């Protein structure tokens, strides 16, 4: 596989990642009907909407209260998931921005320094996703 094909595959992987919105709030809210779930709350902070679910988990006669915090942007894209057990602090489990940055940084390693190739690659990226790539493609040149 040549470098160009490898780059296109990486770009397509990033676009596919961007297209997936993640688990949606309405899917999570139905969990309240399960006996383990004790609380579900939602709130807004700046441009993010948070959905917080609390449930109990029993393992070998030890019960823990687990709280999951899902953060969404206004386009209903899941941005991050954090978890806390009992009274501990939240620990990030998943972060869209960090994953996307890692994928793009991996792409940059393979990008040629040739402006013509970069311009050709830019034409292959759908318009909706050009903002995701634009600053990184400038850096590569």
Predicted regions and their residues:
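Short, solvent-exposed aromatic-acidic interface loops
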Residues: 82-90
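Amphipathic, interaction-prone secondary-structure segments
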Residues: 33-79
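Long terminal segments
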Residues: 1-39, 93-141
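A short, polar/proline- and glycine-enriched secondary-structure boundary/capping micro-motif
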Residues: 62-65, 89-98
């Amino acid at each position: 596989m040549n470098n160009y094909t490898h780059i296109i595959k990486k770009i397509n992987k990033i676009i596919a990642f961007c297209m997936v919105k993640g688990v949606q709030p309405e899917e999570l809210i139905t969990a309240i009907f399960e006996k383990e779930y004790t609380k579900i709350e939602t709130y807004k902070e700046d441009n993010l909407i948070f959905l917080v679910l609390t449930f109990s988990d029993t393992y070998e006669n030890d019960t823990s209260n687990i709280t999951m915090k899902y953060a969404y942007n206004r386009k209903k894209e899941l941005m991050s998931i954090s978890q806390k057990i009992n009274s501990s602090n939240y620990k990030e489990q998943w972060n869209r921005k960090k994953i996307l940055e890692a994928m793009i940084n991996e792409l940059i390693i393979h990008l040629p320094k040739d402006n013509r190739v970069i311009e050709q690659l830019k034409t292959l990226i759908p318009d909706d996703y050009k903002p995701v790539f634009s600053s990184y493609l400038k850096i590569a040149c």
